[in-house]
């Protein structure tokens, strides 16, 4: 039996709900409503079904995207959108131009335990994360929850091969 070479070590890096940042962005929306003000041109306001997540790169160099590991514990849908924002929301508002394309969309149907996803876009997005890891220690994401799921129903991580 021939071997394909040495097994690559993998790193499974979780996407973690950033409760403080999510709260800060929700306060921005409330503040604008209370004062009767409008958002800045191009500003992205957090919608009720969106939360901010972060990925702390425990290693920045020599990472190759392998796969997303996304599980919903009930039927529903999540859209994971990366941001180019290095966040200081008390100083800088998130702008729509800082949202990265493509987004990765994952869903679980009512009659299935299996997860489905938009494979090509999710793969392209994941491969971009390998490049972003070289210049970032932290990456932020907007996750949009749909069809009855919320943060408590999601477990998500990105798996990289160490080169």
Curated annotation (Swiss-Prot):
Subunit structure: Interacts with BEX1 and BEX2.
Annotated protein name in UniProt: Olfactory marker protein
Native species: Rattus norvegicus
Tissue and organ distribution: Uniquely associated with mature olfactory receptor neurons.
GO molecular function, one term: peptide binding
This protein's record includes keyword Oxidoreductase: no
Single GO cellular component term: dendrite
Main location as per UniProt: cytoplasm
Keyword vocabulary terms for this entry: Acetylation, Cytoplasm, Olfaction, Sensory transduction
Similarity field: Belongs to the olfactory marker protein family.
Gene Ontology process terms (BP): neurogenesis; sensory perception of smell; signal transduction
Domain of life: Eukaryota
Compartment list: Cytoplasm
Gene coding for it: Omp
Residue positions, PTM N-acetylalanine: 2
Gene3D superfamilies: Olfactory marker
A Pfam family reported for this protein in Swiss-Prot or TrEMBL: Olfactory_mark
Role, per record: May act as a modulator of the olfactory signal-transduction cascade.
């Amino acid at each position: 039996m021939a071997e394909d070479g040495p097994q690559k070590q993998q790193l499974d890096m979780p996407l973690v709900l950033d409760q403080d940042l999510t709260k800060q962005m929700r306060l921005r929306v409330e503040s604008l409503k209370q004062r009767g003000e409008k958002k800045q041109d191009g500003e992205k306001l957090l919608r009720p079904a969106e939360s901010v997540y972060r990925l702390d790169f425990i290693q920045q160099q020599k990472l190759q995207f392998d796969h997303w590991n996304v599980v919903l514990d009930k039927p529903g849908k999540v859209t994971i959108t990366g941001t180019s924002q290095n966040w200081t929301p008390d100083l800088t508002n998130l702008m729509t131009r800082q949202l990265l394309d493509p987004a990765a969309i994952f869903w679980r149907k009512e009659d299935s335990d299996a997860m489905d996803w938009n494979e090509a876009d999710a793969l392209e997005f994941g491969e971009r994360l390998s490049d972003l890891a070289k210049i970032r220690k932290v990456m932020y994401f907007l996750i949009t929850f749909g069809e009855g799921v919320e943060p408590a129903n999601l477990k998500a991580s990105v798996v990289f091969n160490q080169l």
